[in-house]
């Protein structure tokens, strides 16, 4: 995609629990972080619910659809989500709602495929509820890396020079 065109080096460290540096192919997964936002139509939930189109229903159906689809994904696949916006009060059909997903896989191509499945599930949820998938916003990503040995060795040298802090028991909680 050209995101690193003309870039000579990227200094990156994902600090593990052992606070050490390493090199070579990373053993972890990469991810894309996506916020799906739906728009519907507000209505009084008791007085005229037929006038409403619940964006929250779209979010919930996306989550249900994703959980059924997840059963048929690779064992290495991981995903997580939280509902960020589910409406303001129970007696109003929510006109807006959003859900935040992490799609995790072992390589860039598989992450993109997983993300495309998420998009399809979101579009299906909007169709089922008569709402609109208003936006799909990438909040961040972390592609699987291949870490550079000379940079890792320099980082280790700097850690040795600066020294790590002495952790107290309370710091570990």
Where are these regions (language model features)?
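Histidine/acidic-residue-rich, glycine-tolerant segments that coordinate divalent metal ions
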Residues: 1-94, 104
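Metal-dependent amide/peptide-bond hydrolase catalytic core
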Residues: 57-173
């Amino acid at each position: 995609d050209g995101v690193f065109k003309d870039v000579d080096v990227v200094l990156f460290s994902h600090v593990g629990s052992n606070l050490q540096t390493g090199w070579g192919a990373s053993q972890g997964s990469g991810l894309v972080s996506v916020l799906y936002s739906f728009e519907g139509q507000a209505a009084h939930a008791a007085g005229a619910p037929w006038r409403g189109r619940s964006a929250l229903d779209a979010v919930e159906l996306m989550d249900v659809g994703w959980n059924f689809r997840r059963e048929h994904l690779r064992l290495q696949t991981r995903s997580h989500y939280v509902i960020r916006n589910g409406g303001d009060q129970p007696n109003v059909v929510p006109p807006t709602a959003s859900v935040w997903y992490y799609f995790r896989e072992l390589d860039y191509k598989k992450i993109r495929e997983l993300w495309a499945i998420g998009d399809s599930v979101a579009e299906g949820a909007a169709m089922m509820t008569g709402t609109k998938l208003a936006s799909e916003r990438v909040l961040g990503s972390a592609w699987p890396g291949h870490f550079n040995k000379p940079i890792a060795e320099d980082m280790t040298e700097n850690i040795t020079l600066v020294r790590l802090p002495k952790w107290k028991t309370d710091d570990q909680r």
